[in-house]
Amino acid sequence: MTKAIATIVLLIATIINISCDNSTIYNKYINADTRGWGKNEVMEYTIDSIAQTGTYNLTLGLRINNTYPFQNLNMLISQTIYPKNITYTDTITCRVTDRQGKMNGYGVTLYQYSMPAATMEYTKGDSIKVRVIHNMKREVLPGIVDI
């Protein structure tokens, strides 16, 4: 009986170790203004130096509360790679709610969203500056807590 339990525990531990992904090189949220995210409020993130040449996935995370008034959130994301001084820009749309107004994110009063933004090749020593702005018609978006 104890041998069977030990085998199950070992199997679960192995699965957990295999599924863990330790490749995150940068993770940061910036708080939006308490009134909401302003159209001219640029969220800027700087990655000082890439340690290893390779392919990296850029993922954008959001935290939104239930006062956000729209179904979607459109954002412009640009990343400048130094020392090459090359800038890539893309538009990302986050589907915040379904058609009935139910939040699609994870959470109870604060909803978490995670969206793939880009897959990029970086060279060892590159530094990256990522800028995110919202691309909605409304000047200030209430309900946006962190980006």
Give the residues covered by each predicted segment.
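An anionic, turn-rich surface loop/hairpin at beta-sheet edges
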Residues: 91-121
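Noncatalytic modules at the cell exterior or secretory-pathway interfaces
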Residues: 52-60, 120-137
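Short coil-to-beta strand junction motifs in C2/discoidin
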Residues: 69-76, 143-146
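Short acidic/polar inter-strand loop motif in beta-rich domains
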Residues: 64-67, 112-115, 134-143
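Post-signal-peptide N-terminal segment of Sec-exported extracytoplasmic proteins
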Residues: 41-70
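C-terminal motif of bacterial Sec signal peptides marking the signal peptidase cleavage site
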Residues: 16-19
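Bacterial signal peptide processing site
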Residues: 21-24
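Post-signal peptide N-terminal segment of mature Sec-exported envelope proteins
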Residues: 28-48
